């Protein structure tokens, strides 16, 4: 090597080592996450954005459903009470309820103290007149003989107008759990139930894990003989999913590394060459993680799991180089021959991965950036570093023994052209008959939660009566008071819809926390003490109630007339306060993306069209309320982003086509490269559909990657040298690179995380077909 060459080699090594050091420095300061909301769209419509926020941080996302089973009902009830007592004193939980009265005391005291500001009855006509009071007393007399008579007898002297009962009726509507020994039980009586809500958001997995650990500790301290605890909820699923992602990333990467290493040893029979083969992979992975961390502020665990794919594709470059070094040649001369094709293959792969880079899903955008940076760095290390480190005189001599047999088999692939045409045409005809690929945009199909866990969650929800919202009204406003007033405007039309049978009921933050304007109106409607006393005296005539029995009532109304108005800050820590926090949301950002929203979950919706019509008539044009059908809107959201991904995929394919035309300047040669890729995508789609897989946006991403990785095979087949030795080594290198690719992506397909499994399985099948079809269609 001449001095100039040695200087360039040393410079390449220095730049490489400094780059690795910089990457390690950045990675050491980069946070890692497993928040699956990264695989929700980043910029949907305003209504869909609210849906995404609720999936991440809504009140339901903070809910933990707990069951204690095993043993007698008495023992289970005792454990439930001990657990609830311990958790109510835990700062990590905003509310804990197991059906005991103790858990409802703060809410009951709040409703009683502020009943005249909370009850809509305060502003009804004649409510505090002699006529209205007489009607209320007559109703009280009838209620005293009902099953609720004991409660009425206790509160009657202070609440003859029935404000507390009115509010309780207002909150009724959801299903209630069974009760035994004063605590909640499942329908079959075999499981005591608790409902805990964490202060931490559902997406804060670290905090969710700590809260769940505290819950386990409370059970351990309270449990009786033979008892066990089961737990479910979004926070539980998030924690288990993160553990699954972390486990898959390490497990799959380790297995892929071992299998590819065995393949390298079989082919090169040199531990040193084995180490060198993994340098492009390791360098690309470190660079990809560092750049993603700098660009996104954090690296998702799924991005690390996806790093296993670089073991397949990144090691391809080393295989192409090492395998094609013939005896008597060297790495530099071989690279001069390979580099134009290898460089074009890298560029086509980058075009394919760009479909991920511009995705509206932050998680997919991370995968795209990681892959593009990783492949470019892996190719650069192969080009500039490996020739310096590779021993002079190296040649993969085992290729000489393997190549003749492999070449004979490959040359016979041309006999498969007719079956190839039949299969491809049949696949195309089938897809045309179906009207296109059978895409599924069902959000539930992407859930990483195992079926048994989903079934347990469903059982606990049914037994405990936990909310499982399907329809939700979103009422936006510039500020919190505006949102409460918007919710109040919807009360009358929703009540009429309930009476018409369009829905069974609804919840509203204004039921718990009326707007300040409404509170002022109710306070102004309360009569002065002397006027109320005179009206009560007339209304009480002819009733069995003695004089002076309602003095507490007169006192409480007078106190309410001058009492401070209720704000969220003055509400005590309770389930009602948590309900307000879950239904009155301050949104981040400014303009249309900021402000506040009131959420009104609906129950038993029968006529969505009637509800939408009522909303249009009851809300102002500037900030109209919207009805969200959670499942429908979630599926529509994924459908719209799948269509966006389709356009990005087509853009990537067009970019590859333009790149090939600019490089080859021959329509025939471009066709020779693209034909096997198009056929591989077509047949892979059909095989996935016939296997019963639900094709999602992530399968579409996988198909775009089939083009990205398969283009290397078709390019090398199209440009293979006419010299027999070079052709043999080219085909052997393609075969072993494809095996490495199939190992990496095939293992990814076994992941329990739908994002990884969908992409891995699609690319594994498509990559193998790309090589097979390239061999079948190659010109001789």
Provide a role label for each language-model segment:
Residues 1-34, 387-388, 392-442, 775:
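Signature of alpha-helical transmembrane segments and their immediate interfacial
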Residues 24-26, 38, 81-192, 207, ...:
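Alpha-helical transmembrane helix bundles of large polytopic membrane transport and channel proteins
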Residues 26-71, 172-183, 320, 412, ...:
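Solvent-exposed, non-transmembrane loop/terminal regulatory segments of multi-pass membrane proteins
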Residues 149-266, 270-271, 558-657:
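Extracytoplasmic
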Residues 274-320, 669-716, 746:
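Hydrophobic transmembrane alpha-helices and their membrane-interface caps
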Residues 278, 329-359, 722-751:
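Pore- and gate-forming transmembrane helices of large, multi-pass membrane proteins
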Residues 294, 310-325, 339, 343-358, ...:
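Transmembrane alpha-helices and their membrane-interface boundaries in multi-pass membrane transporters
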Residues 417-540:
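Juxtamembrane segments of multi-pass membrane proteins
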């Amino acid at each position: 090597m001449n001095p100039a060459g040695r200087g360039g080699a040393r410079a390449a090594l220095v730049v490489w080592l400094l780059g690795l050091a910089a990457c390690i420095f950045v990675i050491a300061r980069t946070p890692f996450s497993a928040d699956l909301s990264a695989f929700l769209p980043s910029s949907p419509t305003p209504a869909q954005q609210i849906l995404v926020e609720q999936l991440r941080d809504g009140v339901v996302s903070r809910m933990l459903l707990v069951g204690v089973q095993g043993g007698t009902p008495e023992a289970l009830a005792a454990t439930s009470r001990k657990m609830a007592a311990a958790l109510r004193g835990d700062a990590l939980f905003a509310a804990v309820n197991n059906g005991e009265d103790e858990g409802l005391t703060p809410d009951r005291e709040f409703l009683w103290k502020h009943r005249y500001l909370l009850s809509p009855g305060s502003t009804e006509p004649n409510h505090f007149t002699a006529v209205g009071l007489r009607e209320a007393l007559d109703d009280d007399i009838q209620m005293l003989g009902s099953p609720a008579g004991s409660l009425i007898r206790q509160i009657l002297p202070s609440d003859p107008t029935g404000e507390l009962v009115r509010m309780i009726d207002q909150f009724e509507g959801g299903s209630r759990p069974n009760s035994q020994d004063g605590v909640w039980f499942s329908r079959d009586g075999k499981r005591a139930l608790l409902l805990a809500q964490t202060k931490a958001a559902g997406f804060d997995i670290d905090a969710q894990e700590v809260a769940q650990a505290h819950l386990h500790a409370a059970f351990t301290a309270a449990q009786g003989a033979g008892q066990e605890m089961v737990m479910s909820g979004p926070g539980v699923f998030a924690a288990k999913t993160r553990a699954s992602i972390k486990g898959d990333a390490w497990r799959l990467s380790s297995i892929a590394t071992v299998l590819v290493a065995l393949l390298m040893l079989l082919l090169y029979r040199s531990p040193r060459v084995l180490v060198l083969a993994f340098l492009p992979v390791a360098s690309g992975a470190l660079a990809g993680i560092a750049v993603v961390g700098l660009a996104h502020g954090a690296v998702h665990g799924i991005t690390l799991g996806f790093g296993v794919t670089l073991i397949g594709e990144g090691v391809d470059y080393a295989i192409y180089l090492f395998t094609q070094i013939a005896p008597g040649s060297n790495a530099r001369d071989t690279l001069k021959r390979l580099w134009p094709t290898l460089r074009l293959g890298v560029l086509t792969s980058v075009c394919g991965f760009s479909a991920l880079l511009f995705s509206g899903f932050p998680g997919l955008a991370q995968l795209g950036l990681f892959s593009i940076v990783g492949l470019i760095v892996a190719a650069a290390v192969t080009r500039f570093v490996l020739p310096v480190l590779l021993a002079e005189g190296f040649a993969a001599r085992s290729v000489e023994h393997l190549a003749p047999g492999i070449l004979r088999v490959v040359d016979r692939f041309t006999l498969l052209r007719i079956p190839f045409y039949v299969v491809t045409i049949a696949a195309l005809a089938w897809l045309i008959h179906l009207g296109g690929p059978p895409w599924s945009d069902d959000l539930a199909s992407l859930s990483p939660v195992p079926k048994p866990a989903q079934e347990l969650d469903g059982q606990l929800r049914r037994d405990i009566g936990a909310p499982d919202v399907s329809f939700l009204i979103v009422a936006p406003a510039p500020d919190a008071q505006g949102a409460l007033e918007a919710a109040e405007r919807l009360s009358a039309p929703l009540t009429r819809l309930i009476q018409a049978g369009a829905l069974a009921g609804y919840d509203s933050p204004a039921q718990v926390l009326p707007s300040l304007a409404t509170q002022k109106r109710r306070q102004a409607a309360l009569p002065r003490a002397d006027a109320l006393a005179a009206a009560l005296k007339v209304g009480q005539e002819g009733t069995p109630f003695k004089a002076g029995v309602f003095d507490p009532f007169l006192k409480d109304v007078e106190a309410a007339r001058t009492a401070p108005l209720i704000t969220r800050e003055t509400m005590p820590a309770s389930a009602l306060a948590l309900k307000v926090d879950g239904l009155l949301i301050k949104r981040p950002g400014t303009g249309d993306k900021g402000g506040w929203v009131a959420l009104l979950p609906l129950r038993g919706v029968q006529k969505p069209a009637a509800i939408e019509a009522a909303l249009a008539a009851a809300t102002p044009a500037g900030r109209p309320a919207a009805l969200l059908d959670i499942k429908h809107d979630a599926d529509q959201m994924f459908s719209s982003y799948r269509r966006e991904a389709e356009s990005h995929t087509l853009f990537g394919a067009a970019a590859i086509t333009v790149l090939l035309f600019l490089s080859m300047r021959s329509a025939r040669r471009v066709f020779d490269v693209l034909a096997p890729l198009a056929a591989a995508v077509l047949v892979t789609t059909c095989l996935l559909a016939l296997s019963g897989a639900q094709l999602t946006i992530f399968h579409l991403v996988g198909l775009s990657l089939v083009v990205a990785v398969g283009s290397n095979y078709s390019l090398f087949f199209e440009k293979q040298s006419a010299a027999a030795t070079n052709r043999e080594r080219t085909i052997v290198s393609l075969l072993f690179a494809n095996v490495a690719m199939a190992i990496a992506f095939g293992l990814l397909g076994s992941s329990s995380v739908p994002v990884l499994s969908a992409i891995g399985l699609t690319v594994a099948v498509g990559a193998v077909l790309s090589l097979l079809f390239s061999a079948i269609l190659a010109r001789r």
